[in-house]
Amino acid sequence: MEQKFKTDSMNEDRISDLPDALLLQILSSLPTENAIATSVLSKRWRSLWTMLPKLKFDSNFNPVFDDDNIDPTMFSENVYKTLSLHKAPVLESLHLSFEGRTDCLHVGIWIATAFARGVRKLVLDSFYQEDQTVTLPSVLFSYNDSLEILKLKCAIDLDFPSRVCLKSLRKLYLDQVHFKDEESVCNLLCGCPSLQDLVVHRYSNADVATFTIASPSLQRLTIEDLRQEGGYGNGSYVINAPGLKYLNINGVIDIESCLIDKALELEEAKISNVSGITNENILESLTSAKRLILHLSPLEVKVPTGKIFDQLGCLELLTHEREWWNLLSIMLDSSPKLQILKLTDVYLHDNKTNPDERKWNPPKCAPECLLFHLETFLWIGYEWQRGDEKEVATYILENARRLKKATFSTKRIGREKLEDFEKRREMLNELAIVLWDSNSCHLVFEST
């Protein structure tokens, strides 16, 4: 018994003798409630948790109450008590997950206390409870110079009658939050002079018909608008961000317009699942892009003509979209300096239309990019059995005079299909013959 006591004491001493930095790193990996519970282990641990740089609370996992009987008031008191006892020089982040029925006064106290502690990252995740939402007190955002990252999610109402002032905010995430009106959107974004990264997730435009994003400092923008059935279809987006470098738009469907002012510094744009935009040509706004990733059909959006993508060096298209090959022809003609072309089938051939319904009409004259600039051609999910895909591949190999490397990735063939092995080998030989006159191009075939 005495020997066991000595062993336990030695183990305790070993842990207690660890540097504070290492102990705090260990505690930071735990939920804040569990980290606080370690204070009973020994005198060494009693106040260690108060120096944690990151705090995270989730009312769903409150150890005092079960999931069916969560007491919002008790949860609020625990959060406030923890914040009031916090002694770390800097509060790096505060993550709060709570019910939509939580008292707005309590939420305001949390935010005010965190701001007073100089919090750099604030995450507010309010989950719906009986369709109730939390309205954030706008006065708390009237001035703050420490917050760098703000994430707001779900059952949160935003009403900003006047401009906020978040001087140091660099990243803003708006995930299914509800704005009172268009003015509230403007007052929030215009009050973030250092904003560089904005992510907007919406499932309906019931709150704001015209969602305007105006920010001269913005460099990265992601819009995901996967509106649910029965949502409004007459809204619009207006993007005024002259310094924008990276743009990602996904799911903007059946709206009146998506107007993007000329983004002259645009490096990369990805446009996915966009259709039914009635008034504006979204692609015409991307003419300065150096890299384009287009996951859309030319049947669903207006496609510009002319050599307007004169800075485009890399283009990626999805080959499962309807009449994708027509979009390819247009983009080849419109991109005189294209150097890299990537075709991808993300569905691994399972979602392609009947070959009898597909017909590719190649450009009448070889595009300038093929004759003078294209160096890399990659086709992932190349379906060698289809005549139309063979036509596209052959056309590019025949006309790309400066091509250095062409890679075709095909679906792996099972050993039981020996006949398909032979047919694929013949196809590969035919493509290789096309390149015999070009000793500089390296042809690669892969199976996935």
Curated annotation (Swiss-Prot):
<dbReference type="Pfam" id="PF24758">
    <property type="entry name" value="LRR_At5g56370"/>
</dbReference>
<feature type="repeat" description="LRR 7">
    <location>
        <begin position="319"/>
        <end position="345"/>
    </location>
</feature>
<dbReference type="Pfam" id="PF08387">
    <property type="entry name" value="FBD"/>
</dbReference>
<feature type="domain" description="FBD">
    <location>
        <begin position="359"/>
        <end position="410"/>
    </location>
</feature>
<feature type="repeat" description="LRR 4">
    <location>
        <begin position="204"/>
        <end position="225"/>
    </location>
</feature>
<dbReference type="InterPro" id="IPR001810">
    <property type="entry name" value="F-box_dom"/>
</dbReference>
<feature type="repeat" description="LRR 5">
    <location>
        <begin position="226"/>
        <end position="251"/>
    </location>
</feature>
<dbReference type="Pfam" id="PF00646">
    <property type="entry name" value="F-box"/>
</dbReference>
<protein>
    <recommendedName>
        <fullName>F-box/FBD/LRR-repeat protein At2g04230</fullName>
    </recommendedName>
</protein>
<dbReference type="InterPro" id="IPR032675">
    <property type="entry name" value="LRR_dom_sf"/>
</dbReference>
<feature type="repeat" description="LRR 2">
    <location>
        <begin position="149"/>
        <end position="176"/>
    </location>
</feature>
<dbReference type="InterPro" id="IPR055411">
    <property type="entry name" value="LRR_FXL15/At3g58940/PEG3-like"/>
</dbReference>
<dbReference type="InterPro" id="IPR006566">
    <property type="entry name" value="FBD"/>
</dbReference>
<dbReference type="InterPro" id="IPR036047">
    <property type="entry name" value="F-box-like_dom_sf"/>
</dbReference>
<dbReference type="InterPro" id="IPR050232">
    <property type="entry name" value="FBL13/AtMIF1-like"/>
</dbReference>
<feature type="repeat" description="LRR 1">
    <location>
        <begin position="72"/>
        <end position="98"/>
    </location>
</feature>
<feature type="repeat" description="LRR 6">
    <location>
        <begin position="271"/>
        <end position="296"/>
    </location>
</feature>
<keyword id="KW-0433">Leucine-rich repeat</keyword>
<feature type="domain" description="F-box">
    <location>
        <begin position="12"/>
        <end position="64"/>
    </location>
</feature>
<keyword id="KW-0677">Repeat</keyword>
<dbReference type="InterPro" id="IPR053781">
    <property type="entry name" value="F-box_AtFBL13-like"/>
</dbReference>
<feature type="repeat" description="LRR 3">
    <location>
        <begin position="177"/>
        <end position="202"/>
    </location>
</feature>
